[in-house]
UniProtKB/Swiss-Prot annotation:
GO biological process: chemosensory behavior; male courtship behavior; monoatomic ion transmembrane transport; sensory perception of taste; signal transduction
Cell compartment(s), UniProt: Cell membrane
Family: Belongs to the insect chemoreceptor superfamily. Gustatory receptor (GR) family. Gr57a subfamily.
InterPro entries per the UniProt record, alphabetical: 7TM_chemorcpt
Keyword Nuclease in record: no
Name of the protein: Putative gustatory receptor 57a
Segments passing through the bilayer: 14-34, 49-69, 84-104, 144-164, 172-192, 296-316, 375-395
Originating species: Drosophila melanogaster (Fruit fly)
Gene it is expressed from: Gr57a
Length: 416
């Protein structure tokens, strides 16, 4: 409960999602702000989002160009591993590209994005007024604050600590670069968490609608036959509305989510190479250099936590929500058996089942990649296989360097 000490008691879905959407807005990755416990689109919010993106790009590459102009920085880069430098350059390029895609796509779909929350709020109002449902916004808000607070703290500490360690006389520039890098990479990360939270919200409502469809509850709560039939129709319409919301989420997040997932998958494999491949060479330097290498690898491991968590956990939430949606539809199929005296329900059930066959609704990202547990298995196998290949490559590279050193030593010994 201490987590919610500084936050007002959530009463609507806007209050529940406010914390995570504020973070997304501060990163410039949505086009609506928060005013009086609701979300609104204005020219000010649009201008702010674009200004944050432009400022982050300018400061990021401006500070980088100034740093690269320093002689000592160029000397340190000349001594660095070429593959690590290539990976770092690729990470910077992909991160800025993904951030730009995320900002532009969510600006374009800002009204549809806002419409998802408005439709969800309207559905919640019907659940509370007609069925007396308790949606437990407090629990959801507490979870968002705890998870994102921990992940954000770890991410900021890792990036800024690494910047301070490598600063060596250019601390202000490195910290500015680290701040801009945090915004550029954090925006897509928070967007992924928002998508994950929306999927979880829909799953909670699907489970609630399953309880409302139980004949025991309907007979106890609505004994009048005409009221009971009205409530059944309302529940069925809300189930269909939640399915439409899944389709709307897919449209809004298609491009930004696909770009972020491609970036996370590509960079996770590369960062794993740096972690495990470079650790092979630790121990061959002096004690001070070894300590510095271990600290940098530790910072890198912490930076990997947010993208890996999002990459592997988000499909699980999506898959579970689809599972709950299918359970709702199976309960709707049984309405004919539970209420045989209500012949007017038969056309409703038949139309919904026909719509279900045609729709085949799933959570997807761009290129129609279905977000499910199969995707988690695919991502995990890719990461493991790449890890093994990269470790083998790193060990081969180190072995080649050792052979070259032995060759040079032998040539010096025989006098060549």
């Amino acid at each position: 409960m201490a987590v919610l000490y500084f936050f007002r008691e959530p009463e609507t879905v806007f209050d529940c999602a406010a914390f995570i959407c504020i973070l997304q807005f501060l990163m410039g990755c949505n086009g609506f702000g928060i005013r009086r416990s609701t979300f609104r689109i204005s020219w000010a919010s649009r201008i702010y989002s674009m200004s944050v993106a432009i400022a982050a790009f300018c400061c990021l590459f401006g500070s980088l160009s100034v740093l690269l102009a320093e002689e000592d920085i160029r000397e340190r880069l000349a001594k660095a591993d070429n593959l690590v430098l290539s990976i770092s350059a690729l990470e910077l390029l992909m991160s800025t590209l993904v951030f730009g895609v995320t900002v532009i796509s969510l600006q374009v779909f800002a009204r549809r994005h806002l419409g998802i929350y408005q439709r969800l709020a309207a559905l919640d109002a019907r659940l509370m007024s007609d069925f007396g449902a308790n949606l437990n916004y407090r629990k959801m808000l507490r979870k968002n604050i705890a998870v994102l607070g921990i992940v954000t703290t770890i991410y900021l500490m890792a990036i800024n600590s690494a910047a301070v360690q490598v600063a060596s006389g250019h601390r202000a520039l490195f910290l500015l670069f680290a701040l801009c890098y945090t915004i550029v990479t954090g925006g897509p990360h928070f967007t992924g968490y928002v998508h994950m939270t929306l999927a979880e919200m829909l799953g909670i409502r699907f489970r609630l609608l399953q309880q409302l469809l139980q004949p025991e509850f309907l007979n106890w709560r609505f004994p009048q036959l005409h009221v009971q039939e009205l409530r059944i129709r309302q529940v069925v319409s809300m189930i269909q509305e939640l399915h439409y919301l899944i389709q709307e989420i897919n449209r809004v997040y298609a491009l930004s989510l696909w770009a972020a997932m491609a970036h996370d998958l590509a960079m996770s494999t590369s960062e794993l190479y740096i972690l495990f491949g470079q650790s092979v060479g630790i121990g061959q330097q002096n004690e001070e250099e070894n300590g510095s290498c271990y600290r940098m690898l530790g910072y890198l491991a912490l930076v990997m936590i947010p993208p890996l968590y999002k990459l592997l956990i988000a499909p699980f939430y999506c898959d579970r929500t689809i599972y709950e949606a299918r359970r709702c539809l199976r309960l709707v199929e049984k309405l004919d058996d539970w209420f045989p005296q209500k012949s007017s329900l038969r056309p409703l059930v038949e139309s919904l089942m026909s719509w279900r066959i045609q729709a085949k609704i799933q959570f997807t990202s761009g290129l129609d990649v279905v977000l499910s547990r199969k995707v988690i298995g695919l991502f995990t196998s890719i990461l493991v296989n790449y890890l093994l290949i990269l470790i083998q490559f790193a060990m081969t590279q180190k072995m080649g360097e050792q052979i070259e050193q032995q060759k040079i030593a032998l040539q010096e010994w025989i006098g060549f």
